[in-house]
A protein has these predicted regions:
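Non-catalytic signal-transmission and effector/linker regions of two-component phosphorelay proteins
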Residues: 1-32, 130-152
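Conserved acidic segment of CheY-like receiver
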Residues: 30-41, 46
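Short hydrophobic helical patches associated with two-component signaling proteins
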Residues: 45-50, 134
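Alpha-helical interaction/dimerization surfaces of two-component signaling modules
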Residues: 48-53, 70, 96
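Acidic, metal-coordinating helix/loop segments flanking the phosphotransfer/catalytic sites
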Residues: 60-78
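Conserved phosphotransfer microenvironments
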Residues: 81-98
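Alpha4 helix (beta4-alpha4-beta5 surface) of REC/receiver domains from two-component response regulators
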Residues: 92, 99, 110-127, 132, ...
Length: 152
C-alpha cells in the first residue's frame, strides 16, 4: 500500500524525526482523511459515514487535478480514492501519496488486477459497497496508521 504525508514542517521536509513527529501528531487528534471520489453524492454519503466513525474528512475532491492540489497543500493522514476521474486515473496522486508516506486505499469498481501494477498491493475497496463497511475499512486503516506511521 502506498503512503502519504503532507506537511511543511522541517521534520517532514528533511525526513529527520518524521516517524516520531507524525506518530505524536496522529495519536493526539482525529485522523485527517482526503476523500477523492468523482461522484458528489457518493462522496457526501461516505464523508458522513467516515465522520460518524470518528475520522475527520478534511478534504473532498472530485477530479484528479483537485486531488493533486489537495495532496500538495492540505495536511492529511490517509486517503480514500477512486481510481478513475473525468480528467484521468488517480495513479499520479497514488504515487505522491506513496512517496510522501501516507496510507491510502482505492474505492473503485476496478478489480485488483485492473489496477496499475505499481499499486496492486494497496487496499482496494470495491464499489458498490455499503458505506458502513467502507467506513469500517478506512477506520481499520486509520488504526494501522496510528500504530505505525511507516506502514506500507
Amino acid at each position: 500500500m502506498a503512503k502519504l504525508s503532507v506537511s511543511d514542517s522541517p521534520e517532514r521536509r528533511t525526513g529527520f524525526g518524521r516517524a516520531n513527529a507524525r506518530e505524536r501528531s496522529i495519536n493526539q487528534r482525529k485522523l485527517r482523511v482526503l476523500l477523492a471520489e468523482k461522484m458528489h453524492l457518493i462522496a457526501a454519503d461516505l464523508a458522513f459515514e467516515l465522520e460518524q466513525e470518528g475520522l475527520e474528512v478534511t478534504a473532498i475532491s472530485h477530479t484528479l487535478a483537485e486531488t493533486m492540489q489537495l495532496i500538495a497543500h492540505k495536511p492529511i493522514d490517509l486517503a480514500l480514492m477512486n481510481v478513475e476521474f473525468s480528467d484521468g486515473k488517480s495513479y499520479p496522486a497514488a504515487r505522491r501519496l506513496k512517496d510522501a508516506g501516507i496510507p491510502f486505499a482505492f474505492f473503485t469498481t476496478f478489480t485488483q488486477d485492473e489496477i496499475a501494477e505499481d499499486f496492486r498491493t494497496a487496499p482496494c475497496l470495491r464499489k458498490p459497497q455499503d458505506t458502513h463497511r467502507i467506513a469500517a475499512a478506512v477506520k481499520d486503516l486509520a488504526r494501522r496508521a496510528r500504530r505505525d506511521p511507516e506502514i506500507p
